[in-house]
Regions:
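N-terminal export signals and maturation junctions of secreted/periplasmic proteins
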Residues: 3, 8, 15-63
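Short amphipathic alpha-helical segments that mediate assembly, nucleic-acid/protein binding
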Residues: 4-5, 53, 69, 147, ...
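Peptidoglycan-targeting cell-wall enzymes and recognition modules
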Residues: 32-56, 81-157
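Residues that form generic nucleotide/phosphate-binding pockets
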Residues: 59, 144, 191
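Structural helix-adjacent loops and short alpha-helical linkers that scaffold large soluble proteins
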Residues: 65-67
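Short, functionally critical alpha-helical segments immediately adjacent to catalytic or ligand/cofactor-binding
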Residues: 69-86
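Active-site or metal-binding loop neighborhoods of secreted/extracellular toxin and effector enzymes
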Residues: 156-194
Length: 194
């Protein structure tokens, strides 16, 4: 009897183990969020430059076809010689608004002739910018007819800073060369492609 009970118990346990129900799990695929691919276009940057220098460098590349480091460095070196990137500077060093500079040059490139000086004001009146600001002067500088006349000489490539100084001279008409070429070569070292 013991053997029959033991066999019956073993059979019952085996049957109940086989009779267990199994649940089938369905795999749920995770929600896929598509990330748009943004094309990165490298440009010349100057990480160790002032915010004003960085702004002008970016705007020159954004609104012209200048891609040569030496050309950009030459323009930057000339601006540094003229104004140290201080937009509201009157020749001699006074920091004044556009309307309060009564003699000499004014602004980023020291607009000196009455025509060029007045055209800065007219441009900013027409396009809603401040002629005393970095942004307004940079816009005017890039669009000014004198700069536009010599722009193709900067948009070429492969010249030295010294060679780019020729169109820079005609663009600015400086009286004193000063350190503009030294500043330009300094920018050549500081400007990086990234």
């Amino acid at each position: 009897m013991k053997a029959t009970t033991l066999a019956l118990t073993a059979l019952t346990l085996t049957s109940s183990a086989c009779a267990s129900t199994y649940t089938v799990r369905q795999e749920v695929s995770p929600t896929v969020t598509e990330i748009p691919v943004v094309k990165y276009d490298p440009t010349w940057k100057c990480p160790n430059c002032s915010p004003e220098e960085q702004y002008v460098l970016a705007e020159l590349q954004e609104h012209t076809k200048i891609s040569d480091r030496n050309a950009l460095a030459t323009i930057m070196g000339n601006i540094k010689q003229e104004s140290k990137f201080i937009p509201n500077i009157c020749e001699g060093g006074a920091r004044v608004s556009y309307d309060n500079c009564y003699s000499g040059g004014y602004g980023l490139i020291q607009w000196t002739s009455i025509g060029r000086y007045n055209n800065l004001g007219k441009f900013c009146t027409k396009y809603g910018c401040d002629p005393s600001s970095l942004e307004g002067q940079t816009r005017y500088m890039i669009n000014e007819s004198t700069f536009q006349r010599y722009l193709p000489m900067f948009e070429g490539s492969g010249q030295t800073v010294r060679q780019y100084m020729v169109p820079a001279f005609y663009w600015l008409g400086w009286g004193i060369k000063g350190n503009r070429e030294i500043y330009s070569y300094d920018y050549v070292k500081k400007i990086v492609w990234s």
